[in-house]
C-alpha cells in the first residue's frame, strides 16, 4: 500500500492480458488473483470493483467509456445511482458536475457526449470517475496515451496523490519516462513473463528499455 508499481513493456508482450485477467475481462487459466487476501479469481467485473479495484482502461473509447453517451451517463458507470430501478437524474447530474469541476474537464455541460471532448478531457473524466470510487487500488493502463501535455501532467498528479493518500496504483505503460518518473517499484514484462524487478533509481532508462525488447540487463 502507498506505492506506485509500474509494469513496463512493449505492446503485445502480455501486459494487456494480465490486466484483463485481474479486472475480470478475461478468464484466468492458472494461479490466483487476490486483493487484501481475498480471492477474486474469475469474479465478475462488478464483483472485482466492489472488492476494491478501480480501472482506467488503455482504450478510453472501447473499454473506458460509452462514446455516444453523455458525460453524466459516463460518470455514473460503476456507481449506485438508482433506487428501486428508478434513475435519480438529479443525483446523476450533480455527480457529473462535481467530477467535471474537480478534474478540470473542459466541457459545455454534463449533457454533452463524451465523444465530443478532446482526448485529454475524455480521459480526465474517466480518471475522475475511477478515482471517485476511493478504492485501495487503481489500475492505470496507458493513462496518458495520445493526450496533450497539460492533461498528462494533471493525470500524473492525480496518480501521485492517490499514492500519497496511502492507496496503491498499478501503472501499466509503454512510456519509459512515465514509468521511471512515477513508479516506486518497476516490473518489466517481455513475451508474457516478468523479466526484471527494480526499485526506484536502481535502473536507468536505457537499461530498462533494453529489457523491454528482450535484451539483458548488465547493470550491477
Name every feature range the model reports, one short phrase each:
Residues 1-220:
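Glycine-rich phosphate-binding loops of nucleotide-dependent enzymes
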Amino acid at each position: 500500500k502507498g506505492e506506485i508499481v509500474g509494469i513496463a513493456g512493449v505492446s503485445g508482450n502480455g501486459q494487456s492480458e494480465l490486466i484483463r485477467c485481474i479486472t475480470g475481462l478475461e478468464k484466468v487459466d492458472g494461479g490466483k488473483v487476490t486483493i487484501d487476501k481475498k480471492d477474486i479469481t474469475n469474479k465478475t467485473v462488478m464483483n472485482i470493483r466492489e472488492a476494491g479495484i478501480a480501472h482506467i482502461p488503455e482504450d478510453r473509447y472501447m473499454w473506458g467509456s460509452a462514446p455516444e453517451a453523455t458525460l453524466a451517463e459516463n460518470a455514473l458507470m460503476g456507481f449506485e445511482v438508482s433506487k428501486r430501478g428508478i434513475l435519480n437524474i438529479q443525483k446523476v447530474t450533480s455527480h457529473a458536475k462535481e467530477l467535471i469541476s474537480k478534474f478540470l474537464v473542459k466541457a459545455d455541460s454534463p449533457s454533452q457526449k463524451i465523444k465530443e471532448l478532446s482526448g485529454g478531457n475524455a480521459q480526465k473524466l474517466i480518471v475522475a470517475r475511477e478515482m471517485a470510487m476511493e478504492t485501495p487500488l487503481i489500475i492505470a493502463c496507458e493513462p496518458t496515451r495520445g493526450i496533450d501535455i497539460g492533461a498528462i501532467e494533471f493525470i500524473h498528479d492525480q496518480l501521485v496523490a492517490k499514492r500519497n493518500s496511502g492507496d496503491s496504483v498499478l501503472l501499466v505503460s509503454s512510456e519509459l519516462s512515465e514509468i521511471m518518473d512515477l513508479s516506486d517499484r518497476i516490473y518489466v514484462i517481455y513475451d508474457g513473463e516478468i523479466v526484471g524487478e527494480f526499485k526506484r533509481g536502481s535502473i536507468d532508462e536505457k537499461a530498462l528499455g533494453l529489457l523491454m525488447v528482450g535484451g539483458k540487463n548488465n547493470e550491477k
